[in-house]
Amino acid sequence: MRLFLSLPVLVVVLAMVLEGPAPAQAAPEISSTLERIPDKLKEFGNTLENKARAAIESIKQSDLPAKTRNWFSETFNKVEQLKTTFS
């Protein structure tokens, strides 16, 4: 029974493989690919720029820089106090 079912499946798969890719799946020509490279690079650059600007704005809007600056100041003051204590 298994052999009876597997043979038609094998024939269908073999037919699909031998048929080749569909026209929409065929590889594009190299010249058209090369022509699109500058557009793709510009699109990538614009996307990267927008994401970087958004990240910088997010950092500016948050209180992270102030907290970091305060933490460093406090830590530096503690180190200075330790120096004066043990000197």
UniProtKB/Swiss-Prot annotation:
Keywords assigned by UniProt, alphabetized: Lipid transport, Secreted, Signal, Transport, VLDL
Principal cellular location given in the protein's record: secreted
Coiled coil feature spans: none
Any one GO biological process: negative regulation of cholesterol transport
Signal peptide: 1-26
UniProt key word Translocase: no
Entry's family note: Belongs to the apolipoprotein C1 family.
PANTHER family the UniProt entry points to: APOLIPOPROTEIN C-I
Protein name: Apolipoprotein C-I
